[in-house]
A protein has these predicted regions:
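Alpha-helical scaffold domains
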Residues: 1-201
Length: 201
C-alpha cells in the first residue's frame, strides 16, 4: 500500500500547479497542496482504477482500502482522490460519518458530497442528519448533499417541511441559501414556499 501511495504522490507532484499551491499555503487550508486541477485528478482516478484494479493486483489492495488510505493523508489531492475512488456500495454509514466529521475545508466538503455522498443509498438520511448538527462543516455537507439530491428526486412532503424549517433557521449558511435557491427553481409552488420562509423571518 505504501508503495502505491508514494507512486500516486509522485504523479501528483509531477502535475503540480505552483500558483494554486502557493495560494493554498498562504491560506493554510491544507498541510500539503500541490494545486492539481480537478480534471487532472479525475483522469488520474480513472487511470488508477483501470491500471490498478482492471486485473488481479500483485498486492491485495482493494479500491476501498486504497480510498481510505488516500483519505487519511493530510493532502488535498489525496483526499479528493479518496472521494473519487471509494466504491459507494462499500461505504458504510459509520465510516461516512467519520469522514464527514474530519473535514476541515469547504473544498473537501464539496468534493466529498459531489463525488461520493450523493451516490450513497442513505444519502438523504445523512443530508438531513448533518443539516441538524451544530457543527458548521457538517451542516455544509448536509446542504451540499441535498442540493445534488433535489436535482434528481422530489422531496417527500415530510422531507420538504423539515428542509424548509432547517434551512430557514440557517440563513447565515451560504449552502443553505444555495439549497433554497435550487428548491425554489424547481417549481412555482416551491418558489412561493421559499418566499414565505423569507417573509416570515
Amino acid at each position: 500500500m505504501n508503495n502505491l501511495i508514494n507512486d500516486i504522490k509522485k504523479e501528483l507532484r509531477a502535475n503540480m500547479n505552483g500558483v494554486a499551491s502557493a495560494h493554498a499555503r498562504q491560506t493554510e487550508d491544507y498541510r500539503v497542496n500541490w494545486g492539481v486541477e480537478l480534471p487532472r485528478l479525475a483522469n488520474l482516478a480513472d487511470e488508477i482504477a483501470e491500471n490498478r484494479f482492471s486485473s488481479t493486483p500483485s498486492e491485495d489492495i482493494s479500491p476501498r482500502a486504497l480510498a481510505q488510505a488516500l483519505w487519511n493523508e493530510s493532502t488535498r489531492e489525496c483526499k479528493i482522490l479518496g472521494c473519487m475512488l471509494m466504491p459507494a456500495e462499500e461505504m458504510d454509514e459509520e465510516v461516512c460519518d467519520i469522514w464527514a466529521e474530519s473535514i476541515r475545508t469547504e473544498e473537501i466538503a464539496t468534493m466529498f458530497c459531489f463525488y461520493l455522498v450523493q451516490k450513497l443509498p442513505y444519502a438523504s438520511t445523512k443530508a438531513f442528519e448533518w443539516m441538524a448538527r451544530e457543527e458548521k462543516m457538517l451542516q455544509n455537507c448536509g446542504y451540499l448533499t441535498l442540493c445534488h439530491l433535489m436535482r434528481k428526486y422530489p422531496l417527500s412532503e415530510e422531507a420538504e417541511a423539515e428542509f424548509l424549517d432547517q434551512a430557514g433557521a440557517s440563513l447565515d449558511n451560504r449552502y443553505a441559501i444555495k439549497a433554497l435557491q435550487i428548491y425554489a427553481s424547481l417549481s412555482e409552488d416551491n418558489a412561493r414556499k421559499v418566499k414565505k420562509v423569507a417573509d416570515y423571518l
